[in-house]
Swiss-Prot record:
Protein name: Riboflavin kinase
Residues annotated as signal peptide: none
Protein's gene: fmn1
Family: Belongs to the flavokinase family.
Entries under PANTHER family matching the protein: RIBOFLAVIN KINASE (PTHR22749:SF6), RIBOFLAVIN KINASE/FMN ADENYLYLTRANSFERASE (PTHR22749)
Positions with a binding annotation for Mg(2+): T44, N46
Gene Ontology cellular component annotations, sorted alphabetically: mitochondrion
GO terms, molecular function: ATP binding; metal ion binding; riboflavin kinase activity
Keyword Membrane: no
SUPFAM superfamilies noted in UniProt: Riboflavin kinase-like
Function: Catalyzes the phosphorylation of riboflavin (vitamin B2) to form flavin mononucleotide (FMN) coenzyme.
Lineage: Eukaryota, Fungi, Dikarya, Ascomycota, Pezizomycotina
Domain of life of the native organism: Eukaryota
Catalyzed reactions per annotation: riboflavin + ATP = FMN + ADP + H(+)
Amino acid sequence: MRPDGPRDPVAGPDSGPEPPYPVRLSGPVIKGFGRGSKELGIPTANIPAEGLAEYPDLQVGVYYGVVALDPAKFQYQEDQGEGSTSSTGGAGAGAGAAILPAVLSIGYNPFYKNKTKSIEIHIMPPLSSPSPTAEGAGEVKFHKLPDFYGTQLKLLILGYIRPEYDYVSLEALIEDIRVDCEVARKSLQRPAYACYIDGDEKECSDAVREQRRWLVNF
């Protein structure tokens, strides 16, 4: 069960990711258990878990990082009027992959007692957009994108947030995921992490630039 008490507002050192991070994972977006949107109202993009074989010491739990989707199949667009997003299939001429913040779980989800390990990624809105999961923001509506099954997704895991927990209720699970989103968002807003999303190429380290190139190269 989740321990009582307040959560830390950020995860990971302020100086930036430390080994083993960043962790690279990629694969086509596949159908998951079908619970994220239907039961929880939290859309997730699942990718095959086979890539975890390269990281045998990576523990189950909740993580944060950044993702990119193949722009040839999914073109990200931001609706400036509502602070929400939409997409259209197929990238326009010269369009590149957008790098977006993400929170994800790796494991078995004790609340649902899954038998197989999964990678479930919730893609969040850009850090420059209002947070739909901020406390006091009114009704919580998790960020939602149109379906993009089959689209190649690349993921850089930049840090670890917490272990997996079981919960006394569905509402308690949803609330902890809301907090996970806020912890991920605040963690990624720190300069040493934000550079993975939209850092000035001249200001980023060579290591960060190399990771960004991998992320958007489809």
